[in-house]
């Protein structure tokens, strides 16, 4: 899980979602998981 100021899709499989007021990226590739913070 990467914590970043700006989250971006890193590939076509990445999905940008909102959970508990946080913007997150979920993906098949675990390296692409990101959370805004």
Swiss-Prot record:
Query: Which molecular function terms from Gene Ontology are attached?
Result: structural constituent of ribosome
One Pfam family matching this protein: Ribosomal_L36
Which UniProt keywords are present, listed alphabetically?
Ribonucleoprotein, Ribosomal protein
Q: Would the keyword Ribosomal protein turn up in this protein's UniProt record? A: yes
Among InterPro entries, the record links this protein to: Ribosomal_bL36, Ribosomal_bL36_sp
Q: Which GO terms describe its biological process?
A: translation
The entry's cellular-component GO terms read: cytoplasm; ribonucleoprotein complex; ribosome
Superkingdom, taxonomy of origin: Bacteria
Ribonucleoprotein as a keyword of this entry, yes or no, is: yes
> What transmembrane ranges does the database entry give?
none
- Family per record: Belongs to the bacterial ribosomal protein bL36 family.
Query: HAMAP family from the entry?
Result: Ribosomal_bL36
What is the designated name of this protein?
A: Large ribosomal subunit protein bL36
What gene name does this entry carry?
A: rpmJ
